[in-house]
From Swiss-Prot:
Keywords: Electron transport, Heme, Iron, Membrane, Metal-binding, Mitochondrion, Mitochondrion inner membrane, Respiratory chain, Transmembrane, Transmembrane helix, Transport, Ubiquinone
Subcellular location: Mitochondrion inner membrane
InterPro entries, per database record: Cyt_b/b6_C, Cyt_b/b6_C_sf, Cyt_b/b6_N, Cytb/b6-like_sf, Cytochrome_b, Cytochrome_b_C_euk/bac, Cytochrome_b_N_euk/bac, Di-haem_cyt_TM
Name by which UniProt lists this protein: Cytochrome b
Gene Ontology CC terms, in alphabetical order: mitochondrial inner membrane; respiratory chain complex III
Lineage: Eukaryota, Metazoa, Chordata, Craniata, Vertebrata
Gene: MT-CYB
Residues that, per the record, bind a ubiquinone: 201
Any one GO BP annotation for this protein: mitochondrial electron transport, ubiquinol to cytochrome c
Function: Component of the ubiquinol-cytochrome c reductase complex (complex III or cytochrome b-c1 complex) that is part of the mitochondrial respiratory chain. The b-c1 complex mediates electron transfer from ubiquinol to cytochrome c. Contributes to the generation of a proton gradient across the mitochondrial membrane that is then used for ATP synthesis.
PROSITE patterns reported in the protein's UniProt record: CYTB_CTER, CYTB_NTER
Length: 379
């Protein structure tokens, strides 16, 4: 008799996605990040749900409600810091997941890749709105500065900003709607992640060699479930170490001061995971140009499949492109550092150079190195 696991309508879907899924036998730990991202999402939804039970989205009580959660709610401090640092872990996994996709040519699965890019944008929007909710100084001014960027859009810009604010400045209406969207967004992310998985299972996973793995597949369970659990242990170890020993390591001290529209912080900056894009935005003196560069720094991911000229999918056997890839990684780290520095010499010059390098490597140098490597194959 066939197992109900393979015949029951619901169990069958789970079975084909996580148990009997044919998986390449040679995928490395770089393929762990998909399941880790799923875990991060579950952690964020769970902790967020408990935080929402005690949080009040009102300008007069938001800040004190967060203090109340931290001080008076049972394990409220832990839930709050797990949520805040969970977002950081989420983005670490996201960036590594995208990096793996770039390195091993996973972007050639167009549908999966494009849904993934939309997922990245949605996650960034969700994290930004979440950063506004504690209603500290950096929350308020971050919201003001970032939403104000939309005013650079010709004709409709200023109307659009006021529409998002729900008034003439970031105020009660803004906080309420940000809380509403921040609450619903993770469920949209979960739906998009399901579609992402659906498209991935249409083609199957890539593998480090970049060659077809059809003749050599193994079942996902028990091999990769065990491997994923190891990654999960490391993720939880990192998250709980941050939460229990250094909960404020990645947060801004300014956010422990109540939002004050009359007092601007000396240096407005977003959370660390947005700093690379923020540095690109600041490196262009023109407002509209900066906003375009900011948007393109993310949307360029959708163009990468069209810039792929190599005859090989993976970078595993392409030393020139490998060098460029790691230069790009170093460039992104430089941009992240610059985004957290004040707007003065030499940081401005370094930021402008790193921003030019970012686009130049992706748009020009990588396709060029692919062409050179194609020619070298004929030797």
């Amino acid at each position: 008799m066939t197992s109900p696991r393979k015949t029951h309508p619901l169990a069958k879907i789970i079975n084909e996605s996580f148990i009997d899924l044919p998986t390449p036998s040679n995928i490395s730990s770089w393929w762990n990040f998909g399941s880790l991202l799923g875990t991060c999402l579950i952690i964020q939804i769970t902790t967020g749900l408990f935080l929402a039970m005690h949080y009040t989205p009102d300008t007069s009580t938001a800040f004190s409600s967060v203090a109340h959660i931290t001080r008076d709610v049972n394990y409220g401090w832990m839930i709050r810091y797990m949520h805040a640092n969970g977002a950081s872990m989420f983005f670490v996994c996201l960036f590594l997941h995208i990096g793996r996709g770039l390195y091993y040519g996973s972007f050639l699965f167009l549908k999966t890749w494009n849904i993934g890019t939309i997922l990245l944008l949605t996650t960034m929007a969700t994290a930004f709105m979440g950063y506004v909710l504690p209603w500290g100084q950096m929350s308020f001014w971050g919201a003001t500065v970032i939403t104000n960027l939309l005013s650079a859009i010709p004709y409709i810009g200023s109307d659009l900003v006021q529409w998002i604010w729900g008034g003439f400045s970031v105020d009660k209406a803004t906080l309420t709607r940000f809380f509403t969207f921040h609450f619903i967004s993770p469920f949209i992310i979960a739906a998009l992640a399901t579609i992402h998985l659906l498209f991935l299972h249409e083609t199957g996973s890539s593998n480090p060699s970049g060659m077809t793995s059809d003749p050599d597949k193994i079942t996902f369970h028990p091999y990769y479930t065990a491997k994923d659990i190891l990654g999960l242990i490391f993720l939880l170890l990192a998250l709980m170490s941050l939460t229990l020993f250094m909960p404020d390591l990645l947060t801004d001290p300014d956010n422990y001061t109540l939002a004050n529209p009359l007092n601007t912080p000396p240096h407005i900056k977003p959370e660390w995971y947005f700093l690379f894009a923020y540095a690109i935005l600041r490196s262009i003196p023109n407002k509209l140009g900066g906003v375009l560069a900011l948007v393109l720094s993310i949307l360029i991911l959708m163009v990468i499949p069209m810039l792929h000229l190599s005859k090989q999918q993976s970078m595993m056997f392409r030393p020139i492109t490998q060098t460029l890839f790691w230069t790009l990684a170093a460039d992104l780290l430089t941009l992240t550092w610059i985004g957290g520095q004040p707007v003065e010499y030499p940081f401005v010059t370094i930021g402008q150079t790193a921003s030019i390098m970012y686009f130049f490597i992706i748009v020009t140098l990588m396709p060029l190195s692919a062409s050179i490597e194609n020619k070298l194959l004929k030797w």
